[in-house]
A protein has these predicted regions:
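PLP-dependent class I/II
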Residues: 1-171
Length: 171
């Protein structure tokens, strides 16, 4: 059985609409279980989902192109400020390793640091399980100009931390 959501593909996050395909008997069992849980999605949401699935798929290509541009702005900008990472293949998220300098504080503290001192919100990798430690997840939900501003804010944070390190080394 495969499950799919319309959340990211059709920009319908939070609408809680998706589908399952697979073995007929398993799908029938799932349908029965689902019928005990609720009475289905709100009708306008179902109509919108039908329109998305049956309509032109150009919007999917358009959305993919937007995320690609945002990803490139983010990853290239991070590279310029010394935060290097592999280029994600195709997603609305960047799963970024912590910069080496911040590995010792972990993803949660690094995320707090970015929020408090850089005014940039990311999701700490530890929130996705123990194997997520050492990473942050960055949603490509802002436009390119906002992403560039976030990079500038993070650069200021990194530069200030480097200045503080230099001061400590002088003592």
């Amino acid at each position: 059985v495969e499950f799919s959501s319309l959340s990211k593909t059709y920009s319908m996050p939070g609408w809680r609409v998706g589908f399952a395909v697979g073995n007929k008997k398993l799908i029938e069992a799932l349908t029965k279980i689902k019928s005990y849980l609720d009475y289905g999605a709100f009708t306008p949401v179902q109509v919108a989902a039908i329109a998305a699935l049956n309509g032109s798929q150009k919007c999917v290509d358009d959305i993919r192109s937007i995320y690609l541009k945002r990803r490139n702005v983010l990853v290239e900008g991070f590279s310029r400020i010394g935060w290097n990472m592999d280029l994600p293949k195709s997603t609305m998220f960047v799963w970024a390793p912590l910069p080496k300098k911040y590995l010792n504080i972990g993803s949660l503290e690094f995320s707090k640091l970015l929020l408090e001192n850089g005014k940039v919100a990311v999701a700490p990798g530890i929130g996705f399980g123990k194997n997520g430690e050492g990473f942050v997840r960055i949603g490509l939900v802002e436009n390119e100009n906002r992403i560039r501003q976030a990079i500038k804010n993070i650069k200021v944070l990194f530069d200030n931390d480097n200045d503080n390190d230099d001061d400590k080394n002088k003592d």
